[in-house]
Design a protein with these regions (language model features):
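Flexible active-site lid/hinge loop adjacent to a nucleotide/diphosphate
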Residues: 213-307, 313, 318-322, 358
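A short, gly/pro- and small-residue-rich
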Residues: 247-258, 274-279, 311-317, 499-502, ...
């Protein structure tokens, strides 16, 4: 074979080590530029199709979407001919068109890196010859196929086949909280638990490696650690797209929800495409395992149709249409009945697990999103075989401030006029901000105001920042912008401020202040706060610094009793 550098049509090659968007096993993802093929005149394209076995096809006009469809068939044929020449018969080939008409993604399974790469470069070089005519293309296929047959095999995929139970968790919001709660329930029940997330790798509750390990490397670190009895793996969209899922299968998969986040990145432009990525973990759940799905999220609920596992849904509404559908099909549902977390199954009485008000993470039932997280955790841990008593004990003892740093952490802070509440939360998108505002309102006494520091990482679309500004202005009394300097990701602070300010203006608010750091924003808002106010910061990079500042200023973390008192006081007077 010639060198890889002369393959003009090849845009990108990725060897995905695990199940992925394209196949439930390791796959090569090849991104191609079909510009030359799309630019052929109709007669030349038709002759090429005939030469490659497509018959008397109609290739469509140059550059048209009809030519694109013709190109997809032609490329698939070329891949199979090259693979056959290299010794691989009946190769599974998947294709996806890009937003631009000339972009095509081709995926096929791989076992040996050398052969997989050789096939990708060979395919690109064949496409580079299309302007030379059908005979030149046919000769190039023969030459590249012969070279592929003798290419070095290379390394195998780094795919783990777990020997212990694995829970895989994904979704737009709630992944880390759900993973932490599942791990806590299991640890309280005496299991040695390893879990990986966006915060790092934890073994038996201890951080052993900090960083974002929501991809396959995190799962690998957990499963290779000696003595671990249960692996809890947070599985993010980016890891699935870049390397695939790190394990061949799981025992329980959990999908919390699907909402707009990171759209426009990695070829994922719509919610339906995002849901397709998240669904990968459900497709590798063992047939005897359980898929735990949000019954009230239509994209999540639809994942039940693509898995061989049993279905267990969760919903706050016992009359949820999605829940009824699953129950009628023999599945299970975790829901709320009479203030209790209950499990429903066909032909059985409701199984009472725990009262919602006794689950600190739900903030006395105030936090709808964390009620849903608790329902998901109940489903997953019961599916793993833990007893009702073990699950209830774990839910009751999971303290949001101690066990879930950075997520709905609530403090009481003295100020000259009395005390205020401070909420630190890793809200990073519209749904997260709405949940944060719900919590703020739920602990505010009648005379209190809501003061909010809003901001998120720069890798969101313009519309996300505008929408954050709108939501903040509608929900809070005072709004200031808090930037995340380490997470601008190509944007300037001025650009982000302009977009958020634009959104706030839609709701009739003029934002006056923007801060270079989260801490500066917290200090500014606290300086304006008076007795009974609630201050909140959307944090991303300075959580530990915020915690230190609060402790230095005599703030105390709210325990379950204090939280309940705040909620009841706000509810009794609202």
């Amino acid at each position: 074979m010639a060198s890889a550098s002369d393959a003009r049509s090849l845009v990108e090659l990725r060897l995905l080590d695990g199940p992925n968007l394209y196949l439930p096993r390791p796959a090569a993802k090849v991104t191609l530029d079909l510009g030359e093929l799309l630019g052929l005149d109709v007669a030349a394209a038709r002759d090429l199709g005939v030469e490659l076995g497509l018959g008397n096809t109609r290739p469509g006009a140059a550059g048209s979407v009809f030519r694109q469809r013709f190109a997809v068939r032609l490329v698939t044929q070329i891949v199979r001919r090259l693979a056959s020449a290299g010794g691989a018969t009946r190769l599974a080939v998947r294709t996806r068109t890009g937003q631009a008409v000339n972009v095509l993604v081709v995926a096929y399974p791989w076992r040996n890196a050398g052969r997989a790469e050789g096939l990708a470069y060979g395919l690109a070089r064949v496409l580079d010859t299309v302007t030379a005519g059908p005979q030149a293309v046919a000769e190039m296929i023969i030459a590249e196929g012969a070279a592929l047959a003798t290419a070095p095999l290379g390394s195998a995929p780094e795919l783990i086949r777990p020997q212990i139970p694995v829970v895989a968790i994904t979704g737009t919001n709630g992944k880390t909280t759900t993973a932490r709660m599942i791990g806590h329930v299991a640890r309280q029940a005496g299991r040695l638990v390893g879990w990986s997330s966006t915060d790092g790798v934890y073994i038996d509750g201890q951080l052993v490696e900090a960083g974002d390990f929501s991809g396959p490397s995190g799962a690998g670190r957990v499963l290779r650690h000696p003595g671990v009895e249960l692996a809890v793996t947070e599985t993010a969209r980016g890891g699935i797209l870049r390397r695939g899922v790190g394990v061949a299968y799981n025992d329980v998969s959990v999908v919390t929800n699907i909402s707009a986040d990171h759209l426009g990145l990695g070829g994922i432009d719509t919610l339906d495409q995002l849901a397709e990525v998240k669904a990968v973990i459900t497709k590798i759940t063992k047939p005897g395992g359980w898929c735990v799905l949000n019954a009230d999220d239509p994209r999540t609920l639809a994942m039940r149709l693509g898995t061989k596992a049993r279905i267990w849904v969760f919903t706050r509404d016992p009359n949820s249409p999605g829940g009824r559908t699953v129950l009628s099909g023999g599945g299970r549902m975790t829901t709320l009945l009479g203030g209790w977390v209950c499990v429903l199954a066909p032909g059985a009485d409701p199984l009472q697990v725990v009262e919602v008000i006794d689950v600190p993470m739900t903030l006395a039932g105030l936090s709808r999103v964390n009620v849903e997280n608790a329902l998901a955790v109940t489903s997953a841990t019961l599916a793993l075989g833990f007893s009702v008593e073990q699950v209830a004990d774990g839910l009751r003892s999971f303290d949001p401030n101690e066990n879930n740093p950075g997520r709905m952490n609530i403090w009481t802070l003295p100020v000259p006029s009395g005390t205020i509440s401070v909420v630190i939360d890793l809200a990073h998108n519209e749904a997260g901000l709405e949940a944060l505002l719900e919590i703020m309102g739920g602990i505010r006494p009648p005379h209190g105001r809501l003061l909010l520091g809003v901001g998120t990482a720069g890798d969101r679309g313009d519309e996300v920042f505008v929408r954050l500004g709108e939501i903040a202005a509608v929900g809070a009394d005072v709004v200031e912008i808090v930037h995340k300097g380490d997470y601008l990701r190509g944007r300037s602070m001025a650009e982000i401020s302009e977009l958020i300010t634009e959104g706030a203006a839609h709701a009739g608010m003029a934002i006056q202040r923007a801060h270079d750091s989260e801490l500066a924003g917290l200090v500014s808002l606290v300086d304006q706060a008076r007795d009974g106010d609630v201050v909140a910061i959307m944090t991303h990079q300075d959580r530990e610094e915020l915690d230190r500042w609060l402790l230095d200023h005599q703030a105390t973390r709210d325990d379950a009793g204090v939280l309940r008192t705040k909620v009841l006081r706000a509810g009794a007077t609202s």
